[in-house]
Amino acid sequence: MTRLFIVALAAGLVAGPVAAHHPGHKLDEVMGSKEKYFQAIDKEPPAFSLSDADGRPVTLADFKGKVVVLHFIYASCPDVCPLHADRIAEIQGMVNASPMKGQVQFISITSDPANDGPEVLRAYGPVHGLDAVNWMFLTTAAGQSEDTTRKLAEAFGHTFTKTEGNYQVHGVVTHVVDRQGHWRANFHGLKFAPVNLVLYINGLVNEHQAKPAPQTKRWWDKLRELF
């Protein structure tokens, strides 16, 4: 599958009648059968109050009404963190090529606030192709302890092991929070298909809309046949 085709697919999401035909309450069931690295969660996420690169306060509640895609990384990580950031940028590119652009927020949270200062946070996005229009890199707020974001990551299910050279070993997980502020899913590792996360985001964007009119074959079924 070419990247051009993926972008074209993303551009068609939530457009016209497509918006009315999504898996609805079966979204998790469908994605679970389609994507082996998907995990349905459906519970309240850990609340947080952090700071962006400019020192502005940011809470998860600020994004109520949007789908939030968040993950934990740190700038000096030599291996999986940059790959994870690249994957998030790829997914963001597909989302932002569609009408969903204003309905999804991407968040990276540093687990190493002692070393990831404002300049580091500002420089990270452009290097990995992350678009600041709906992405931000968060760190601890003034007065918070250095382990605040690590404890937050642990509340999201991560475990940390420190090796020589202050290298942090932790799992690679992409967390998804729906428009009502519920933690809906995890996509584990880097082997999941990016288009599956885009389709899942689209399902959450369209959730709780009016019931669809009957049709011979739903758009989701047609997409499943393509992959």
What do the predicted segments below correspond to?
Residues 4-13:
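Sec-dependent N-terminal signal peptides
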Residues 15-17:
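N-terminal signal peptide c-region/cleavage motif recognized by signal peptidases
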Residues 25-61, 86-87:
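N-terminal "domain-start" segment that seeds a small globular fold
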Residues 45-46, 68, 171-173:
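Short loop/turn microsegments at loop-to-beta-strand junctions
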Residues 59-84, 88, 106-108:
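Short active-site neighborhood of thiol/selenol oxidoreductases, capturing the structured segment around
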Residues 65, 75, 109-114, 140-142, ...:
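Solvent-exposed coil/turn segments that connect beta secondary-structure elements
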Residues 83-151:
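Structural microenvironment flanking redox-active thiols in thiol-disulfide oxidoreductases
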Residues 151-159, 163-227:
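Thiol-/selenol-based redox modules, centered on thioredoxin-like
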